[in-house]
Curated annotation (Swiss-Prot):
Signal peptide: none
Primary role: Catalyzes the oxidation of 3-carboxy-2-hydroxy-4-methylpentanoate (3-isopropylmalate) to 3-carboxy-4-methyl-2-oxopentanoate. The product decarboxylates to 4-methyl-2 oxopentanoate.
Pfam families: Iso_dh
Positions bound to substrate: R97, R107, R135, D226
Gene that specifies this protein: leuB
Subunit and partners: Homodimer.
Protein name: 3-isopropylmalate dehydrogenase
Residues noted as binding NAD(+) in the record, renumbered to the chain: 77-90, 290-302
């Protein structure tokens, strides 16, 4: 069997605790399923800065580049608030995204039936919610040049950011969206601001042309991004796959995340382009939540987002679709049984810590995969 190489970067805060529960699942899969996972581990974020003076070392960067997939925990915390900007903990994640050329960020917003009452919206609006937001990750206003603050004199300054998209960047992210839609409900909604932004005009044109040329079997809708934000909280279940640029994707995916009730529940994936020879994509998987330094080391963090990120890894990097389905079903089954970490605790449920939640999910996964 060909080895499946995983590089683990637990990071800071609750990252190591959540990653610990994924390690148990990997060990079980190797033992019971002969899955062939080979794991290595490195430092990223604040802990890497403490050890190496950088948010990720060159050696660990090379290991990430060589791996089939990277599992990432979380970075940051008040301890590193005063470090130089270029070596801040978050710079490690940005370096990974850049060097791995990860242009497509996949953010599922799934509301488990057992948690519908935890959403800020009415349960009937979110129960059964299953949206996939696909955000372009390497272009747009976050990376466009010029990006600077100019001193105009007389006490006045000017901040400049530049929104830039080329045709190929839009084509490839649209292609990912249409391909993902084919495995779901076959619907894509593209969001931009073509009414006020030239980049939005081009985005709309290129998505439309890509759809017509290669993906006419998929239903395509266009929506202005501000209207899309409104519709996400008005009638979220109307959406299947949403594709949008870096800035709007950053905002809309966080809006969608809170429809589900807890950031501690949500995974994400960042994918690169398929390799010309093997067809494999570089990929990084991470929970949406941050490092939560206030609860780090207390054993109470919710590991579900990290475990669900590993399920995405099984699906998209290793084509282990049944195993991914089983792991996601295991999470749902545990929630149906009323087992909760503190962040999603509700009346009548049983509160557990990180390890007990992880072990409950593993037990369900074992039963489903037996």
């Amino acid at each position: 069997m060909t080895a499946r190489n995983l590089f683990l970067l637990p990071g800071d805060g609750i990252g190591p605790e959540a990653m610990g529960e994924v390690r148990k699942i990997i060990a079980y899969m190797n033992e019971a399923m002969d899955a062939g996972f080979v794991t290595d581990e490195g430092l990223v974020g604040g802990c890497a800065y403490d050890a190496h003076g950088a948010a990720i070392s060159e050696a660990d960067m090379q290991k990430a580049l060589a791996a089939d997939a990277v599992l990432f925990g979380a970075v940051g915390g008040p301890k590193w608030d005063s470090v130089p900007y270029e070596v801040r903990p978050e710079a490690g994640l940005l370096r990974l995204r850049k060097d791995l050329q990860l242009f497509a960020n996949l953010r599922p917003a799934i509301c488990y039936p057992a948690l519908a009452s935890a959403s800020s919206l009415k349960p009937e609006l979110v129960e059964g919610l299953d949206i996939l937001i696909i955000r372009e990750l390497t272009g747009g206003v976050y990376f466009g040049e010029p990006k600077e603050i100019i001193d105009l004199g007389n006490g006045q300054k000017r901040g400049i950011d530049t929104q830039v998209y080329d045709t190929y960047e839009i084509e490839r992210i649209a292609g990912v969206a249409f391909e993902m839609a084919r495995t779901r409900q076959n619907r894509v909604c593209s969001m931009e601001k073509r009414n006020v932004m030239k980049s939005g005009v081009l985005w709309n044109q290129v998505v439309t042309e890509t759809h017509k040329a290669k993906y006419s079997d998929v239903q395509l809708e266009h929506m202005l991004a501000d209207a899309g934000g409104m519709q996400l909280v008005r009638q979220p279940k109307q959406f299947d796959v949403i594709v949008t640029d870096n800035l709007f994707g950053d905002m809309l995916s966080d809006v969608a995340a809170m429809l589900t009730g807890s950031l501690g529940m949500l995974p994400s994936a960042s994918l690169g382009a398929p390799d010309g020879k093997t067809g494999k994509r570089k990929a990084l998987y991470e929970p949406v939540h941050g490092s939560a330094p206030d609860i780090a080391g207390k054993g109470i963090a919710n590991p579900i987002a990290m475990i669900a990120s590993f399920a995405m890894c099984l699906r998209y990097s290793f084509n282990m679709v049944k195993e991914a389905d089983d792991l996601e079903k295991a999470i749902a089954n545990v929630l149906d049984k009323g087992i909760r970490t503190g962040d999603i605790m509700a009346d009548g449920c049983r509160q557990v810590g990180t390890v007990e939640m992880g072990e409950a999910i593993l037990a369900e996964f074992k039963a489903l995969s037996a």
